[in-house]
């Protein structure tokens, strides 16, 4: 089991905070009726403009019991090869949306993910940070992680 270090968590969480700030502005201007692809393009351009490497619609291959599955998953955004952002534009998030991101985290080995739903009346209550359970957290980070990342993947 890999151990998260504070520098890595703070770096990724800083990106998450910037994406959320930007997303709240986008949602207040566009509302909840644009296509998911519109929100995705805006976030991709915002992150790229701010110096991040962003892969959009990144195809992910994985190995299952020795069988190589090529292009088995497609993540919405992979930022700096460390953060997976999954976007939705639905009335409300359902358990399968969380499981989808959790699966992406598990099969890619990434530690943190962000799920954002632009389909609600507000972004409040329509986003979640997910922590991959394959990572353990040092004692010094336990309380911080519980506050910032309440949903485990």
Describe the predicted segments one by one.
Residues 1-53, 124-125, 129-153:
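Solvent-exposed, charged helical/coil patches
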Residues 31, 75-91, 104:
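Conserved catalytic cores of phosphodiester-cleaving nucleases, focusing on short active-site segments
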Residues 48-66:
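A short acidic/basic microdomain associated with nuclease active sites
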Residues 64-68, 124-125:
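Short, solvent-exposed polar/charged micro-motifs at secondary-structure junctions
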Residues 88-139:
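Nucleic-acid nuclease catalytic cores
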